[in-house]
Amino acid sequence: QAIVGERQVDARRCISYLTIEHDGPIPHELRPLMGNRIYGCDDYQLACPWNKFAQRARVPDFDVRPALDSPTLLDLWSWDEAMFLRHTEGSPIRRIGFVRWQRNLAVAMGNALAATDSASEHHGALLTALHAWSARGLFTAPGREDDGALVAEHVQWALGQAGP
């Protein structure tokens, strides 16, 4: 949806922009298009003809981090801010901050709910995790009330994707 014409990209519709740079609510019409992407989108890397020459970087900073090696959405959703900071230390992911991280996860969880059978164990676990977050209320530090409201709005949207 970000490619709007020949050699034209609308960055406001780009998944990388929405998940990394954009600090407000993600537009409703773009949320389903994000799928399970919570930090950027490297689809352009797959399409780039020059990448057929790419080689694996031999720099430790580019190695897979254990906490980010194939985690589930539920694993990532269970992190508190301290865990987020610990697991993203030295990673570019850290710069989005914990609030955008949770916002992006809520969208991905909503999309997972829309794509899974409502009778499945995974569907139930996603619902339970989102409802648990909602039940805690907006416990945010003074001056950070807007952060809680941003995540709450995306959690409510995600819950709405569960179907009947």
Annotate the PLM regions.
Residues 1-16, 37-39, 43-61, 129-130:
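Iron-sulfur cluster-binding cysteine motifs and their immediate structural context
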Residues 11-30, 81-85:
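Short, charged low-complexity linear segments at domain edges
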Residues 66-99:
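Alpha-helical adaptor scaffolds
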Residues 85-87, 117-135, 142-143, 164:
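Amphipathic alpha-helical scaffolding segments comprising HEAT/armadillo-like alpha-solenoid repeats
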Residues 101, 139-152:
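Positions within the helices of HEAT/ARM-like alpha-solenoid repeats
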Residues 102-108:
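HEAT-repeat alpha-solenoid elements in large eukaryotic scaffold proteins
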